[in-house]
Amino acid sequence: MSVADIRKGAEQKMQRSIDAFKNDLSKIRTGRAHTGLLDHIQCDYYGSPVPISQVANLTLIDARTIGVQPWEKKMVPVVEKAIRESDLGLNPATQGDVIRVPMPALTEERRRELTKVVKSEAETAKVAVRNLRRDANEQLKKLVKDKEISEDDERRAGDDVQKLTDRFVAEIDKLVVTKEAEIMTV
């Protein structure tokens, strides 16, 4: 394994951590409606759990309402039940074969709780990135120990890994600021 492989592997894993963090952020509800909010909700389709997006058409009716139109008429009550029982605190209403999912306004207290959740998720993502940095540095030390690279090369590669870590941590911080602004906007 070369220094370039270690660096590239660390970068790919750090990017995956960022992607997972973005996915977690998308599940945190803001005052505005977006179809991604329902992505992780599963409903029962012929005995197997599937995401709602695979059995229904998701659209934005307005800034605070998501429209869910199941492709099969008999799926309407199943999808509605799945949305109602999700951990998002949503109260869907059916009109014919369209389920309207209004986004309730967030209270100030709830907004503050959500910002704490965002910060907690961010800290988890930062820890994951730092752990990946540690793993990469350990691999570099092993290369020095096995006399495959010099200590100077290890130091240079370690600096590169640190720059990667700083870049990804800064990206996490930027995502947090954006999400907090989104949550606190009334």
Swiss-Prot record:
Under the heading Gene3D superfamilies, the entry gives:
3.30.1360.40, Ribosome-recycling factor (1.10.132.20)
> What's this protein's function?
Responsible for the release of ribosomes from messenger RNA at the termination of protein biosynthesis. May increase the efficiency of translation by recycling ribosomes from one round of translation to another.
Superkingdom as given in the UniProt entry: Bacteria
Record's GO cellular component terms? cytosol
* Protein name in the entry: Ribosome-recycling factor
UniProt cross-references to Pfam families, sorted A to Z: RRF (PF01765)
Kindly report the protein's main subcellular placement as a broad class: cytoplasm
InterPro entries in the record, alphabetically?
Answer: Ribosome_recyc_fac, Ribosome_recyc_fac_dom, RRF_sf
Please state where this protein is localized.
Cytoplasm
